[in-house]
């Protein structure tokens, strides 16, 4: 087979929604830690309080519990957070967010849903942020 007929394959580095959120939070001035863990016996990932993948804090003392997913799964993750007693307790004094990532062309975009909780119900405030490229997020 000649060099002219060989197909060149460029490996694209896949980046997870969790890594995208970690990089994005850093650019927003937060330090963050992944708090979900792999349970090798059950062969599942286990989140903090069954809903929090990342905990982030900034210099002002804002403390966020973040559930990370793809844009397509936001509604199911919001329901998961809404039903979680741990998330309710967390949200009484801190922030809970769901980050949903989607690649639009060459750029990653994130939809952020903030949970506002009072003793009667959880309410959601949605914000969209655009312009995070995978190259930028990976740095």
Predicted regions and their residues:
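Catalytic phosphate/metal-binding cores of nucleic-acid and nucleotide-processing enzymes, i.e., regions
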Residues: 2-139
């Amino acid at each position: 087979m000649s060099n002219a007929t060989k197909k060149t394959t460029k490996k694209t580095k896949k980046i997870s929604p969790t890594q995208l959120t970690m990089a994005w939070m850093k650019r927003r001035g937060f330090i963050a830690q992944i708090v979900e863990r792999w349970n090798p016996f059950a062969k599942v990932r286990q989140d903090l309080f069954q809903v929090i993948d990342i905990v982030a804090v900034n210099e002002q003392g804002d403390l966020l519990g973040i559930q990370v997913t793809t844009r397509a799964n936001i509604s199911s993750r919001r329901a998961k957070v809404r039903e979680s007693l741990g998330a309710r307790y967390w949200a009484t004094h801190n922030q809970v967010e769901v980050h949903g990532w989607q690649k639009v062309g060459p750029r990653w975009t994130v939809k952020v849903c903030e949970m506002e909780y009072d003793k009667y119900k959880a309410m959601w405030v949605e914000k969209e942020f655009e312009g995070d490229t995978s190259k930028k997020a990976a740095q």
